[in-house]
Amino acid sequence: MASAALAAAPVQAQPVLKIGAIPDQNPEKLNRLYGVLAEELGSKLKVPVRYVPVSNYAAAVSAFRTGSLDLVWFGGLTGVQARLQTPGTRVLAQRDIDAKFTSVFIASGASGLKPFTDAGQLRQLKGKRFTFGSESSTSGRLMPQYFMGRNGVKTTDLAGGRPGFSGSHDATLALVQSGAYEAGALNEQVWRSNVKAGKVNTDKVKVIWRTPPYADYHWVARPGLDQRFGKGFTNRIQQALLSLNPKQPRSALILELFGAKTFIPAKASNYDRIEAVGRQLGKIR
């Protein structure tokens, strides 16, 4: 009887580490990147790891808050929002390029805009059809709007009295290159990767200004992972990210897709300026 009872007892399923990211680029690239990363983390951490895509930036923050995602690649602003909504979270890592990240302003060939030699020339955007990326994007909206404001350009000064919101950096580039918008802002790493991939026609679109640097993307882990997966598990995730080695094929592919040479440690205070700007522009309350 005892053996029968034991046989009937349900087998407890091994917990799955659910990873996610803000959808800042096209879904095909994201599925490839995070699919490979899930395999790498699963191999290093010895637990099942699954990539769970989300529809928009706000959904990434919400899924993290509710526990639908355990580990998320956030932008600067969304990471701050997530940490404020989910006490006890931990910032783990950023890319080598994230400590001094930049956005670029781009313009279509038909816009008449030429490369700016100083930030004051951002005033030339007044009256232009202009698009940001996602409303919650750090590099595609928050910091570009901040620098515009510092140089006397309000969003109400743009054509139609407001900007467009393309939803992603790739979409911003496509819309400006097609002429649907005369100008826009996106993160420089995405611009560079598209140029490298041959997806930019420099006769139709060009960079007109680059922002000063600021801190941006970072990995954030939910609280309670050590309780679910074992003591020290959050530290193990951090080490798995920091140990990605460009000399190993799978790690090299991951780093290439991230546009980085390595991941480095990060901490919440790196994003204090982003929080201050977010509050100033009403994106954090």
What do these predicted ranges mean?
Residues 13-78:
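Extracytoplasmic small-molecule ligand-binding "clamshell" domains
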Residues 14-17, 25-36, 220-221, 225-285:
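An extracytoplasmic/periplasmic, membrane-proximal ligand-sensing/linker region
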Residues 23, 103-115, 215-229:
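A bilobed periplasmic-binding-protein/Venus flytrap-type ligand-binding module shared by bacterial periplasmic
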Residues 36-46, 139-165, 195-201, 276-284:
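Ligand-binding cleft/hinge of the Venus flytrap
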Residues 51-62, 75-77, 155-174, 215:
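Short helix-initiation/N-cap motifs at beta->coil->alpha
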Residues 73-86, 149-150, 175-178, 182-202:
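A ligand-binding cleft/hinge motif common to bilobed small-molecule-binding domains
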Residues 89-98, 158-162, 195-213:
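Short beta-strand->loop
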Residues 95-151, 157:
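A conserved helix-loop-strand patch within extracytoplasmic ligand-binding domains
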